[in-house]
């Protein structure tokens, strides 16, 4: 399976498991609460589509990078991400850091800065991971979808793309049928992703 097929099957198998988990934990109410809000404020659907795009492109990039030899660039974005989140917290939410936290941030800046210097450039994958997630989390907080229900909608709204990638774009369904152990791998991926 290539990165697009793996992404598709991950999305298709994660949603049922996360739905079961939310049902078991009593969190499905968040899904229906957001649905009621969409009925009252149809413009919220646009935000949910943007949220789904930001979230699922991150999930896709996480799979695409290593498969396509860009794992280091994607990983560097994940190392840079907490620093951007600290910056967002301090600037937008006026959070204060303790002396130990400032020391930790300074050491992280040194480590990540050294790696960027060693590589000699900042790839688009690094920038996307480091900036898109903070935007995603900020907007989810602003639109009050920062719960499992919001994530459920992110996955639900990407289903048409996942179905296309899994059933039209590729012949992966034939691969899954011919190698039945892959079905268990896909289900395991969905289960682990839902956790």
Regions found by a protein language model. Give the residues of each.
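Structural motif at transmembrane-helix junctions in multi-pass transporters
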Residues: 2-5, 60-77, 148
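Transmembrane alpha-helices of multi-pass small-molecule transport proteins
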Residues: 3-54, 132, 153-169
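Hydrophobic/aromatic residues within transmembrane alpha-helices
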Residues: 6, 10, 65-66, 91-93, ...
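Hydrophobic/small/kink-forming positions within alpha-helical transmembrane segments
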Residues: 19, 52-60, 82-87, 134, ...
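Loop-to-transmembrane-helix transition segments
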Residues: 30-57, 124-129, 173-195
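Membrane-interface helix caps and helix-loop-helix hairpins in membrane proteins
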Residues: 64-69, 94, 114-124, 145, ...
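C-terminal transmembrane-helix exit sites in multi-pass transporters
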Residues: 80-100
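Hydrophobic transmembrane alpha-helices of multi-pass small-molecule transport proteins
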Residues: 97-116, 129-131, 159
